[in-house]
């Protein structure tokens, strides 16, 4: 029986060329699977047909936009996930979902091999293959760009030789990956980290320096999840789309950073994530109002580790699942409204309210109505500082005073 290889298909040059190339190299039939995670651009029906025209025996397009929003993006919101305190995991979040659907296609179509278009230099090869190893360790993996030393010139020559129905002349100077959660741009002149990004790089956000009226938006959360915008009920997908539109129009969510890749190198990336940045900013503020101090302090470390695990391709790890359980439990009171002003590239919190708020006006005010018993403070301060006081006295007695 002829083997079948399931290919993660994007419709571009590299994965289109991979169809006949994989067939030649492995002798297998190729099943192309394109997963819609809100990347937009070309019509997915056209992408499906292109895969067939390039030699795939089956071609599937999976609409995973709602699933991506609810089951991958919202956990990132609840975990305030910003890798290196900045990057909202635009690409990293989509990879485990794509892996899930590749495995499903392999089971449906009798596939024994899975293929992706990642190089040996990036993070995505790890994300794909760690996920495949967790979900389907029986499937073999082939990565043409890495395993067969694939280059763009080689891909173009192969496409022309085979007469493949793809445009092999236009060449973007950048490598671009985009989805519902944001857009990532790298390579080209950006590899010189002194070069500033040019406006042509951006597609999800308007120039924040352009004068325009501010936009005020109220986001309603229930147990850490956005459920309404300006009082109108929204699904997770609708919330992200709407905030991408409104925050993007104000230039919110542009990031230019040098990040630490999993493979050990530093890489310069330019990101656009207007909806993600707005949602995380609002969620962080609502947590500040509703989450008890020690829980909030501990959760910050959990949030950081959660983001590192996802960035490093360990979505399917037991630790990520356990951290999710902690994060979700911590969200039971994170319900209420946060008002943001979107303007000049910033999402600024200007108001917050919650029935579960731990903010007590009477305790916080310095004016009339103060209910804080200041007579209790003196003894508290003395007891709080007692260990340090005793340690300092001991050091002075022994001649080893601390600086």
From Swiss-Prot:
Per the record, the major location class is: cytoplasm
Task: State the protein's name.
Answer: Argininosuccinate synthase
Q: Name one GO cellular component term.
A: cytoplasm
Domain of life of the native organism: Bacteria
Q: Pfam families per the record? A: Arginosuc_syn_C (PF20979), Arginosuc_synth (PF00764)
Quote the EC number: 6.3.4.5
Instruction: Identify the Gene3D superfamilies for this entry.
Output: Argininosuccinate synthetase, chain A, domain 2, HUPs, Single helix bin
SUPFAM superfamilies the UniProt entry points to: Adenine nucleotide alpha hydrolases-like (SSF52402), Argininosuccinate synthetase, C-terminal domain (SSF69864)
Q: Which reaction does it catalyse?
A: L-citrulline + L-aspartate + ATP = 2-(N(omega)-L-arginino)succinate + AMP + diphosphate + H(+)
Signal peptide limits? none
What metabolic or biological pathway is this protein involved in? Amino-acid biosynthesis; L-arginine biosynthesis; L-arginine from L-ornithine and carbamoyl phosphate: step 2/3
Positions of L-citrulline binding: 87, 123, 127, 175, 259, 271
Organism listed in the record: Salinispora arenicola (strain CNS-205)
InterPro entries in the cross-refs? Arginosuc_syn_C (IPR048268), Arginosuc_syn_N (IPR048267), Arginosuc_synth (IPR001518), Arginosuc_synth_CS (IPR018223), Arginosuc_synth_type_1_subfam (IPR023434), AS_cat/multimer_dom_body (IPR024074), Rossmann-like_a/b/a_fold (IPR014729)
Please tell me which top-level EC class this enzyme sits in.
ligase
Q: Is Ligase set as a keyword in this record?
A: yes
Residues binding ATP: 8-16, 117
Assembly description: Homotetramer.
Where in the cell does this protein reside? Cytoplasm
Q: Which of UniProt's keywords are assigned here?
A: Amino-acid biosynthesis, Arginine biosynthesis, ATP-binding, Cytoplasm, Ligase, Nucleotide-binding
Q: Does the keyword rRNA-binding apply?
A: no
Which Gene Ontology MF annotations are present? argininosuccinate synthase activity; ATP binding
Task: Give me the residues that bind L-aspartate, please.
Answer: 119, 123-124
């Amino acid at each position: 029986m002829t083997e079948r290889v399931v290919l993660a298909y994007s419709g571009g040059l590299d994965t289109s060329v991979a169809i006949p190339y994989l067939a030649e190299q492995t002798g297998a039939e190729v099943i192309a699977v394109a997963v819609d995670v809100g990347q937009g651009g070309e019509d997915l029906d056209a992408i499906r047909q292109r895969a067939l025209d390039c030699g795939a025996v089956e071609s599937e397009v999976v609409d995973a936009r709602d699933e991506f929003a609810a089951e991958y993006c919202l956990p990132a919101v609840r975990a305030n996930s910003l890798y290196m305190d900045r990057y909202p995991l635009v690409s990293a979040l989509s990879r485990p979902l794509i892996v899930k659907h590749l495995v499903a296609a392999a089971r449906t179509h009798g596939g024994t091999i899975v293929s992706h278009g990642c190089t040996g230099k990036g993070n995505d090869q790890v994300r794909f293959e760690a996920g495949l190893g967790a979900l389907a360790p029986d499937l073999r993996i082939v990565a043409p760009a890495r395993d067969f030393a694939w280059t763009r010139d080689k891909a173009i020559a192969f496409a022309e030789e085979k007469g493949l129905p793809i445009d092999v002349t236009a060449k973007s100077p950048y490598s671009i990956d985009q989805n519902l959660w944001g857009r990532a741009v790298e390579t080209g002149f950006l590899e010189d980290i002194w070069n500033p990004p040019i406006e042509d790089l951006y597609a999800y956000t308007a120039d924040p320096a352009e004068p325009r009226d501010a936009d005020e938006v109220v986001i309603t959360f229930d147990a850490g999840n956005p459920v309404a915008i300006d009082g109108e009920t929204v699904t997770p997908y609708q919330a992200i789309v709407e905030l991408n539109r409104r925050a993007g129009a104000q230039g919110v969510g542009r990031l230019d950073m040098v990040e630490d890749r999993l493979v050990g190198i530093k890489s310069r990336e330019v990101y656009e994530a207007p909806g993600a940045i707005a949602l995380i900013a609002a969620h962080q503020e609502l947590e500040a109002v509703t989450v008890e101090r020690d829980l909030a302090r501990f959760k910050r470390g959990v949030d950081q580790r959660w983001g590192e695990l996802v960035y490093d391709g360990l979505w399917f790890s037991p630790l990520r699942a356990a951290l999710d359980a902690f994060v979700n439990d911590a969200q039971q009171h994170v319900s209420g409204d946060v008002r943001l002003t979107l303007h000049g590239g910033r999402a600024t919190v200007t108001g917050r309210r919650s029935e579960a708020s731990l903010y007590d006006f009477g305790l916080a005010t310095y004016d009339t109505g103060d209910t804080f018993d200041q007579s209790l403070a003196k003894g508290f301060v003395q007891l709080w500082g007692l260990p340090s006081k005793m340690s300092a006295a001991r050091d002075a007695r022994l001649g080893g005073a601390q600086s």
